[in-house]
């Protein structure tokens, strides 16, 4: 699949890439092993979620946002309102600086996810945790539409384990950046009694 991205968005994403690389020297935002392939591994990996967002005039919450992936990338790509939840104050300082690259509204929340009460249309996360942990952490977050979760090779095990405690619908989409990568589109999440 080829993604057509307007030049002005590419330019902003390039600025974001430079900022992440600069800050990564002092606070660990992304693995050093991925810096050489940053555009493919991080920018495109995050940007591919935009194809599953029909209406960009929404509120999207990104949990464990540390490096701004995918939240800031999706904001730059046109999502109107993004909240980035990150517990590490140093990473929040980075996110505050990076948020200025986007023309859209970005809110940085420096708290643990479990303590946040917020509602959104879509919730995202990348390299955060397994499904059970994600679902347990977001008890106070109301997700009206769906979750878009970037997952790796253990996604099926995560689904099976989560299905023991939770009811939810899901679609599995192939990542365009990694053969083992998947995008889980989760909806109608309810905890089993």
Swiss-Prot record:
<dbReference type="InterPro" id="IPR003682">
    <property type="entry name" value="rRNA_ssu_MeTfrase_G"/>
</dbReference>
<keyword id="KW-0489">Methyltransferase</keyword>
<dbReference type="GO" id="GO:0005829">
    <property type="term" value="C:cytosol"/>
</dbReference>
<dbReference type="InterPro" id="IPR029063">
    <property type="entry name" value="SAM-dependent_MTases_sf"/>
</dbReference>
<feature type="binding site">
    <location>
        <position position="126"/>
    </location>
    <ligand>
        <name>S-adenosyl-L-methionine</name>
    </ligand>
</feature>
<feature type="binding site">
    <location>
        <position position="64"/>
    </location>
    <ligand>
        <name>S-adenosyl-L-methionine</name>
    </ligand>
</feature>
<dbReference type="Pfam" id="PF02527">
    <property type="entry name" value="GidB"/>
</dbReference>
<keyword id="KW-0698">rRNA processing</keyword>
<feature type="binding site">
    <location>
        <begin position="113"/>
        <end position="114"/>
    </location>
    <ligand>
        <name>S-adenosyl-L-methionine</name>
    </ligand>
</feature>
<feature type="binding site">
    <location>
        <position position="69"/>
    </location>
    <ligand>
        <name>S-adenosyl-L-methionine</name>
    </ligand>
</feature>
<comment type="similarity">
    <text>Belongs to the methyltransferase superfamily. RNA methyltransferase RsmG family.</text>
</comment>
<comment type="function">
    <text>Specifically methylates the N7 position of guanine in position 527 of 16S rRNA.</text>
</comment>
<keyword id="KW-0949">S-adenosyl-L-methionine</keyword>
<protein>
    <recommendedName>
        <fullName>Ribosomal RNA small subunit methyltransferase G</fullName>
        <ecNumber>2.1.1.170</ecNumber>
    </recommendedName>
</protein>
<dbReference type="GO" id="GO:0070043">
    <property type="term" value="F:rRNA (guanine-N7-)-methyltransferase activity"/>
</dbReference>
<keyword id="KW-0963">Cytoplasm</keyword>
<keyword id="KW-0808">Transferase</keyword>
């Amino acid at each position: 699949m080829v993604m057509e991205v307007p030049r002005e968005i590419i330019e902003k994403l390039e600025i974001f890439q430079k900022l992440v690389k600069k800050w990564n020297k002092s606070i660990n935002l992304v693995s050093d092993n991925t810096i050489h392939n940053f555009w493919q591994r991080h920018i495109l990996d995050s940007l591919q979620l935009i194809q599953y967002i029909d209406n960009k005039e929404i509120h999207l919450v990104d949990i464990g946002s540390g490096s701004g992936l995918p939240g800031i990338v999706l904001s730059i790509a046109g999502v109107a309102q993004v909240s980035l939840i990150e517990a590490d104050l140093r990473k929040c300082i980075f996110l505050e600086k990076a948020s200025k690259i986007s023309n859209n509204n970005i809110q940085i929340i420096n708290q643990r996810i479990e303590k946040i009460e917020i509602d959104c249309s879509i919730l995202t996360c990348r390299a955060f945790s397994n499904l059970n942990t994600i679902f347990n952490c977001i008890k106070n977050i109301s997700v009206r539409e769906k979750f878009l979760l970037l997952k790796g090779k253990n996604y099926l095990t995560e689904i099976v384990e989560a299905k023991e405690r939770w009811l939810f619908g899901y679609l599995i989409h192939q990542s365009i950046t990694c053969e083992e990568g998947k995008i889980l589109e989760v909806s109608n999440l309810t905890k089993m009694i």
